[in-house]
Amino acid sequence: MKFGFYSCMSGMPWGGSEVLWARTARLLQLDGYEVTANYKWWAYKAEPLAHLEKHGATVCYRDKPAKPLLKRIFSSNGAKQNWLESERPDAVLVTLGYHPDQILIADECRRLGIPYGINIQCASNFFFIHSDRLDDYRQWYRDAERVFFVSEENQLKLENNIAMKFENAEIIANPFNVDFDAAPAWPSTSDGFRIALVGRVHFQSKGHDIIVDVMKQEKWRKRNLKVCFYGHDQGNKRQLTELIKMHQLEDQMEFVGYSDKVESIWEDNHALLLPSRYEGAPLVVIEAMLCNRIAITTAIGRNRELIDDNESGFIASGATIDLLDDALERAWEKRDQWEQMGQLAGEHIRQRYPKDPIREFADKITSLAKAPAVG
């Protein structure tokens, strides 16, 4: 049996939205299934794709740069065959990094009678589908055997966006990058409290700019609290570092850079600060809670499902200066309880989140192949 994985990722060579399908594909290989994938061509090949190919997967790279005319005419390969027609997978998973992504591959699945599922990694209220395209989007989702969301909040956003109830929806979990039983030591508070924003430096989604506006207030300047930023630059590192300098916040804020050592981050920090404007289900919240740290975050994605406000973390009802300031103020008032609250967060996340999301999702993908053909 063969499973196909189609990624709509087009803005960068790799991203967090790709982790679930790639790890699931690898697990299916280990289970003895064949795997084929369709991914946008980049000059840089992401390591997970190379890993799948090394273990026998066929990967079709679409949108390759056009060859010179003579080379195209005399190419021994000729025109590339349609991916689905040549590979004939028994089922296909289509992954969207963001809800506006078009799902044209669904039309081909329907034409060939191949059952498919759709996984939406992030939906927001920042982009609404134009009414001229509603029928297309509704058809793509309606014909899917299953539509997988990473949070109930994201499902509601997309239902409102295209004015359609998803009768075929299911909530799934993304994999995390820390041991399920992680227990990094609680850092000393003798030099004050350190809170970390872990995530790409992208103001539009992560809200770094909101943190600057909160921390530049006089009351926060006087408090023994430091915000540390961890993550890759995705377009706004320069603004972040220059805002810190502009407001003379060098003592209160620091850009640390990217680190893949999750437990080490939480050995140095007491809490997560994440004022996201939109998310699917932020893994950094799950990882912080698994490391027995509280999260101070917004009511987006899966956060309300995982965090009990004022008990195992602090939730701002929206990504605004005033609302984040309120949540951070509530947290600061209980700063001497953060360690105990973090322990409670660790207990809650282990009760509310699966230990092995990849195995659970792999089982759902294999069930797609047993579904009636679409079309």
What is the predicted role of each segment?
Residues 258, 277:
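Aromatic "clamp/platform" in nucleotide-sugar-dependent glycosyltransferases that forms part
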Residues 308-310, 314-322, 330-335:
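Conserved acidic donor-binding segment of nucleotide-sugar-dependent glycosyltransferases
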Residues 240-257:
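Nucleotide-activated donor-binding/catalytic signature segment of Leloir-type glycosyltransferases, i.e.
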